[in-house]
């Protein structure tokens, strides 16, 4: 066994688990939001095909959630350096909490965007005045994922601060 690594041997596991959690949970939210609001767009397109391009906004907003998870996963994975002299449990836990914060926020935002997008698109087909209200609610739902992204960046930047050197 090599004596080069001075940190905890289980710490990188938690770091990589955080990267995986960020990507998996965010993409689950993006997939749910895209599917749920896409069903609404498809059913609305039968009645009012001229509104399909206008009603694709919830699908796009849900798809962006996966990018947030990708950003955090890349930040975390670049913070885990196998050639570094140490990677402590504090660092692994910081990366795990970063990934969970971003991933679970993306999952919840995706669920909100999917439900609001589905109902909003169908309602917009019957009453076009509801479009602005739907967009505002979608923006607030997207903000949930942005909060998770910001907290994830802050938490991942905490990794490496446990060293006394």
UniProtKB/Swiss-Prot annotation:
GO terms for molecular function: proton-transporting ATPase activity, rotational mechanism. The chain crosses the membrane at residues 13-33, 56-76, 96-117, 130-155. Disulfide bonds: none annotated. It holds the Pfam family ATP-synt_C. Residues 34-55, 118-129 are cytoplasmic. It is a multi-pass membrane protein. The record marks 142 as: Essential for proton translocation. It is found in: Vacuole membrane. Keywords: Hydrogen ion transport, Ion transport, Membrane, Transmembrane, Transmembrane helix, Transport, Vacuole. Residues 1-12, 77-95, 156-165 are lumenal. GO terms for cellular component: proton-transporting V-type ATPase, V0 domain; vacuolar membrane. InterPro entries: ATPase_proteolipid_c-like_dom, ATPase_proteolipid_csu, ATPase_proteolipid_su_C_euk, F/V-ATP_Csub_sf. It comes from the Eukaryota. V-ATPase is a heteromultimeric enzyme composed of a peripheral catalytic V1 complex (main components: subunits A, B, C, D, E, and F) attached to an integral membrane V0 proton pore complex (main component: the proteolipid protein; which is present as a hexamer that forms the proton-conducting pore). Belongs to the V-ATPase proteolipid subunit family. Proton-conducting pore forming subunit of the membrane integral V0 complex of vacuolar ATPase. V-ATPase is responsible for acidifying a variety of intracellular compartments in eukaryotic cells. This is V-type proton ATPase 16 kDa proteolipid subunit.
């Amino acid at each position: 066994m090599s004596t080069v690594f001075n940190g905890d041997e289980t710490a990188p596991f938690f770091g990589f688990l955080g990267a995986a959690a960020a990507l998996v949970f965010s993409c689950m939210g993006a997939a749910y939001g895209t599917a749920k609001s896409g069903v609404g767009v498809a059913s609305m397109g039968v009645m009012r095909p001229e509104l399909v391009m206008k009603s694709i906004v919830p699908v796009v907003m849900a798809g962006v959630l996966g990018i947030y998870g990708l950003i955090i996963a890349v930040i975390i994975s670049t913070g885990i350096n196998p050639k570094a002299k140490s990677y402590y449990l504090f660092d692994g836990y910081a990366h795990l909490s970063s990934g969970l914060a971003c991933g679970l926020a993306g999952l919840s935002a995706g669920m909100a965007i999917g439900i609001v997008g589905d109902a909003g698109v169908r309602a917009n087909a019957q009453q076009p005045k509801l479009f602005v209200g739907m967009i505002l609610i979608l923006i607030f739902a997207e903000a949930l994922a942005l909060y998770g992204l910001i907290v994830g960046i802050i938490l991942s930047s905490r990794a490496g601060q446990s060293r006394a050197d």
